[in-house]
């Protein structure tokens, strides 16, 4: 939903010769900040979230396992959301291959993790749970370097609360 609001605004800035880099940087930083807080809250609230979604697990080992796996993997939402924003930047410049490779990278990492876990006799569930955030980091690094090659080096920082960023939040906020 955020990207559905971001991409048209970003594309308009690119076409109009406006400060597209500044807008992208502010959107990246703002999204990263909000999602970092959201990820921390979600991780801390994981027992409640598991209970709300799988109350049948309460009172047995599945509950604790679901909480553990949820806490490990919840940060993926931060990484994949930033990947989506960077993919929107790339798509605006007609660079579709990089963004379309992101899910392939996830599949490759999961296959590699399962093979490694089987060979090393690791716990498969924990291996796959840890593969989720590691995959998010790899996907973010891949799209970040792709955007950098396109001339967009977006580093987290304090976003400037410009009228455009406020408009973006108003449009994307309800979703």
Roles of regions detected by a PLM:
Residues 1-175:
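Membrane-embedded alpha-helical bundles of multi-pass transporters/translocases
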